[in-house]
Amino acid sequence: MTETAIPDVQSSPDKRHIAINRVGIRDLRLPLFIENAAGEAMPTVARAALMVALPHTQKGTHMSRFIRLLDLKTPISVSALPTLHQKMLDTLHAEEGTISLSFPFFIEKSAPVSGEKALLDYEVVLAVDGNRKHVEVSVEVTVPVTSLCPCSKEISQYGAHNQRSHIVIYAQYNPNQPFSIEDLIHIAEEGASCPIWSLLKRPDEKYITERAYEHPKFVEDIVRDIAMVLNDDPRISFYRISSENFESIHNHSAFALIEHQK
């Protein structure tokens, strides 16, 4: 009995001759290990998007090949993104493409006075985009912080309104230089009135309250202070910073954004 060959429809020619910029899979949820600055493998659950350009001559891409690209046992580092991108292009026989991984990233933080330890989560997006000759690698972090209003402090006899804020930093960097997720998180926290912690005792709360009061900042101050740090960082070629204060005395947020191509 002769076996009948199964048709490979997606590899057949396409008569419309229209190229597709990106085709692939998105919102693929899977467990991964992310390498932190200390070289440790941190477990998380990521949402992945993997896409390539499709030439006008080809009907479809090989969707099943995207799934095999991500090795669930090997930790993914920021520095490994260009290699993963090249592997995707080779596997899909493509000339350009994009990979994006979004996930919660946990850091064990010690409370500022008591030293009590607990995990704090940050939203992170790692991405690489480009062709066989040039790629752009980016890291985006969303960092929760505390902000305290300078105007409120100035006009009040005691106290000042403060609130939780989100700082988002998106940075494209030189893949040939060492760079970590924690680098951007640290820059964001230093740019706020005060960082936040998951576990605090009374001495820690006193410290946070007083530190925020001593470092009042508008959203404008936050993004400008962070921009000054990123301007001096030779590893970064482009950045976008935003700060959103979830105002405690209003039913709206305050927002500021700076982006800069070096």
From Swiss-Prot:
Functional pathway: Cofactor biosynthesis; 7,8-dihydroneopterin triphosphate biosynthesis; 7,8-dihydroneopterin triphosphate from GTP: step 1/1
GO terms assigned for molecular function: GTP cyclohydrolase I activity
Domain of life: Bacteria
UniProt EC number: 3.5.4.16
One Pfam family here: GCHY-1
Site (May be catalytically important): C149
EC category name: hydrolase
Record's catalysed reaction(s): GTP + H2O = 7,8-dihydroneopterin 3'-triphosphate + formate + H(+)
Transmembrane stretches, start-end: none
Annotated InterPro entries: GTP_cyclohydrolase_FolE2, GTP_cyclohydrolase_FolE2/MptA
Swiss-Prot/TrEMBL keywords: Hydrolase
GO biological process, one term: tetrahydrofolate biosynthetic process
Role noted for this protein: Converts GTP to 7,8-dihydroneopterin triphosphate.
Family listed: Belongs to the GTP cyclohydrolase IV family.
NCBIfam families given in the database record: PRK13674.1-1
Alphabetized HAMAP family for the sequence: GTP_cyclohydrol_B
Protein name (database record): GTP cyclohydrolase FolE2
